[in-house]
Amino acid sequence: MRKIILASGSPRRKELLELAGVPFEIIVSEVEETIGAYSSPSDIVMSLALQKASAVAENNSDHIVLGADTIVTYESRILGKPSNKAEAKEMLQLLSGKTHEVYTGVAIIAKDKTVTFYERTEVTFWELTEEEIDAYVASKEPLDKAGSYGIQGKGSIFVQHIQGDYYSVVGLPISRLVRELKQFNIDVTHA
């Protein structure tokens, strides 16, 4: 039987697959995440997801491999994972009181088929005080997250409004993924 392999070390993606009852194994993709010249954020996340999944699929061609990537954008600026606390603070100041977009791209690769898709979610932050930002950055939570916040953690208190898929902001649009897996004869809704 074909296994599902998650090409990611993200604890959030792992948790979402577990919550949905998707059986899987993890093989972390060692692909260097580089953003080339793309026309849109959706192209970027789908391309990076495909690169990650492809790298793992090379040695696991008998299985189904999932890759995913998430970016945050504000006014055409891409906000990836901050490289340090100062950059995290700068990103949070930029997002304070404003609406930004979160894009998560997913690639599903099997021997006979490849599917890519993305979800776009709008997130609006409350106005943040410097003290709130400093305390959050000091917690180190934002340092491994696109846009410098985790909506499922302490960063949730910054969110005034969300339009779209919450789980996509966490890192994996699990409802859409489960539906797309049906194309690969994987149905976890009856498990």
From Swiss-Prot:
Pfam families: Maf. Its cofactor is a divalent metal cation. It catalyses: dTTP + H2O = dTMP + diphosphate + H(+); UTP + H2O = UMP + diphosphate + H(+). It is found in: Cytoplasm. InterPro entries: ITPase-like_fam, Maf-like. Gene3D superfamilies: 3.90.950.10. GO terms for biological process: nucleotide metabolic process. The record marks R12, T70, Q152 as: Important for substrate specificity. Belongs to the Maf family. YhdE subfamily. This is dTTP/UTP pyrophosphatase. It comes from Bacillus anthracis. The gene is maf.
